[in-house]
Structure formats: C-alpha cells, structure tokens
Amino acid sequence: MSDNVPTIAAVATAPGRGGVGVIRISGKNLLPMAQALCGKTPKPRVATYADFTDEDGQAIDSGLLLFFAAPASFTGEDVIELQGHGGPVVMDMLLNRCLELGARLAEPGEFTKRAFLNDKLDLAQAEGVADLIDASSRSAARLALRSLKGDFSRRIHGLVEDLITLRMLVEATLDFPEEDIDFLEAADARGKLDGLRRAVDDVLANAQQGAILREGLNVVLVGAPNVGKSSLLNALAGDEVAIVTDIAGTTRDAVRERILIDGVPVHIVDTAGLRETDDVVERIGIERSRKAVSEADVALVLVDPREGLNEKTRAILDALPLELKRIEIHSKSDLHAHAAGGFGTGAETVIALSAKTGDGLDALKRTLLREAGWQGESEGLFLARTRHVNALKAAQEELSLAALCGNHQIELFAEHLRLAQVACGEITGEFTADDLLGVIFSRFCIGK
C-alpha cells in the first residue's frame, strides 16, 4: 500500500450498550497518538491500563489500551485498540478524540480491506470474516471459520499451482514448433489435465454446498385465496407471522420469513395472490409477490383436494415461470382424505399436509433440502459465495475446452489453461478488478 494511507478509526463493537466497547485504530506510526490519548507509550501486545483523556487532559474513560506494531497486526499496519465501557456516549467521545488526533472515520470493511491489500489474508479469507459475523446457524459459523482460516484458499492455491506447473510444461513446448512431436501426449499433458479437471470438480462440489449453506433457498407460497398459505407459513416458522382468517384475500402484501432447516436458511414468501385488482394497496402487494416469484428457487403450490385446480389456481400457475421448480401441497389434510396423485401443477413431488396438526411438515422440509441440493455438513466443507461457484464453473469450462484441443493445438491448449488460472485467481483476489473489491468490502460492517 502507499505510504500516504491515512489513519482510520471506528467503533469495532456492535451498536448499543454493553459492558465493554472497543475503538479500533489503524495506520502508520501510532505511538504518538497513543501517547496523546493516555499519556503512556504502550508496549506491543501488552494490555496497558490507562485513562483516556481529551485535549485538556480530562478523563473521558478508563480501560485497556492494546498496541500491535506493524506488520504483526490484523491490518499489517500499526493498530491500537481502546477497550472502554460500552456506552454509546463514551464510545462517541473516544471516537471523536481519535478523529481530533488525525484519524478519519473508517469506511465499511476498510480494516479488512487493508489486511487484504497488505497480504495478511486473501480475498476468500476476507469474505470469511464477513460471513462469520453474518452466520445464521452454527453450521454456517463453523464453515465460515474454515474459510477464514484458509481451508478454501488452500484448495484454490493448490489448483493454481497445478495449473502453473502444467502451463510451464506446455508453453515450454512452444519453443520447438519445428519438431514433429506430439508434445501433449509426450509430456502426459492430457493425463495431468484430467487430474486437474477432477480436482476442480471436487472443489466446485464443495463450494456449491457451502453456497447453499450461506445463501439458502428462496421459496414462494402460491395458491388460490384461503387455501392455507398463511397457515403453512406460520407452521414452518413456528410463530404467528401471517394473519389467518376465513376471509379470502386476507394477505394483501407479501409476507417474508426466514427459517432454518438443518442449518440451511430457507427464505419463504407468502404471496398476496397473483391476480389483477383495482385496489391500489393490494396492487403493490401483488407486484411484490411477482418479484418474489421471479427470484424464487421453488414454488409451493397449495391445492385444496376438494376443489382441485380451480380457475384461480390455474391463473396463478400460468403466471409462474415454466422453469421454476414446483412442489404440490394438498392442504388441510386433517379435514379430508388425501387425493391420490397430483392435479397437473407441473410438480414432481406431491405432499399431503396439515398446517394445523403438523402432519407432512417433516416431509416438506426434507423435500426442500433435496431441492436446494443440500447433502449435509461433512468434513472438508467451507462456506462459499455465488461468485466463487461461478469462478470455479468458468475454470471448469476452460479445462473442458482445453481437453477438446487437437494434439497440435498447443497454443490454444495453453490459452485455456491461462484463463482457468485467471478464473481461480479471482476467488483469492490474485486477479480481481478494483470495482469488485469495492462492492465486496462495502458490505462489511464499519469497524471490521
């Protein structure tokens, strides 16, 4: 990084009141700032008890000061942490004092971004920091920690090293174009390529599982009015999150709820119907429902077996994208017998369910996990993002194209290897555009 990088400061603990609050400062040559803050010169990695004072020497708070000298710190720069009492007024006064002494307020994710730019961690590890903070389940937290500790990165670095080795082998043959030799066969380049393809497939399979655990499944509930969509949402959520009455059309806006099934987040939207209406308020809810449908991975199509596919249900089915996966739910199974087979909703799975008694809920949850592609947490998994999966798919495609090259298409073979390496490098940040870095780190919390 440049020598002109400014000193930054921010509250590193969550907003609100707490027993302890932490101010984090990062920059170059921070000992004079520490001296001005508490009248002491701290030793590296030693907790120093001190009064934190304002410009007039009046105590703002008392607590612990920790100093981490560059480069042995989280950001790779000098880092100071002030651990004081966790009230918002005290934290605000301490932060303002740091700003008076020359620091500026840190942007979201700026501490982690500096750690990345100073080679303290790579991009996949940096994203692991945010994912650990945002983890919605124990499984997600465990897998995010693996990414933070470098499990995912080591897999990617291994792929890159193998790609570089194969590229060196292949590109060395380009120095001898006049030789009538099948270099790809002679150097066993194809055998090595097959091994690389298997390795990429393995990492991709793990990344897809990690992405499922991080990003979950988007589900919409659709069906005719008063068929039991809100009751099903409440049953899945285990709470009264939607109003349930005997009046058709009670739900006038899309109701959203997130649940966990075996640690996998499932984002459920109870739609406000998919029909035309003159009611302005209801029309807004219907537009939101249509948007939810367009973003969904699975639609739960609720059908009353006593009525089958009535005109309203058919109209709703016509509004669903053809490629959207569907699960047909025969609702209110406690009130009537389950109809054999489905009603032609386009669903491969039919489940009889009672939101009142809970019968069929476990079967539905298992089916949702299957539709998500979740295979269960296993050794070697790590938390991943959609961009990681897409990058690995790009590498997979380039290696597949390399395998199609003729025996003497060495230059084209080498180019596909290079592009596969670039795709893998995007994951760890070796080849990453600045605008992508800005997007990634802007989603962090301030102080991290």
Swiss-Prot record:
Provide the cofactor list for this protein. Answer: K(+)
Q: Where is the TrmE-type G domain?
A: 216-373
| Coiled coil residues, start to end | none
Q: A Gene Ontology MF term for this entry?
A: GTP binding
UniProt cross-references to InterPro entries, sorted A to Z: G_TrmE, GTP-bd, GTP-bd_TrmE_N, GTPase_MnmE, MnmE_dom2, MnmE_helical, P-loop_NTPase, Small_GTP-bd
Highest taxon of source:
Bacteria
List where in the cell it is found: Cytoplasm
Which keywords are on file for this protein? Answer: Cytoplasm, GTP-binding, Hydrolase, Magnesium, Metal-binding, Nucleotide-binding, Potassium, tRNA processing
* Keyword Nucleotide-binding among record annotations: yes
**Which parts of the sequence bind (6S)-5-formyl-5,6,7,8-tetrahydrofolate?**
R24, E81, K120, K448
Return any one Pfam family short name.
MMR_HSR1
Cellular component annotations (GO), alphabetically ordered: cytosol
PANTHER family linked to this entry: TRNA MODIFICATION GTPASE GTPBP3, TRNA MODIFICATION GTPASE GTPBP3, MITOCHONDRIAL
Q: Outline the subunit composition.
A: Homodimer. Heterotetramer of two MnmE and two MnmG subunits.
Q: Which family does it belong to?
A: Belongs to the TRAFAC class TrmE-Era-EngA-EngB-Septin-like GTPase superfamily. TrmE GTPase family.
**Would you tell me the protein name for this molecule?**
tRNA modification GTPase MnmE
Organism, by scientific name, is Neisseria meningitidis serogroup A / serotype 4A (strain DSM 15465 / Z2491)
Q: What is the lineage of its organism?
A: Bacteria, Pseudomonadati, Pseudomonadota, Betaproteobacteria, Neisseriales
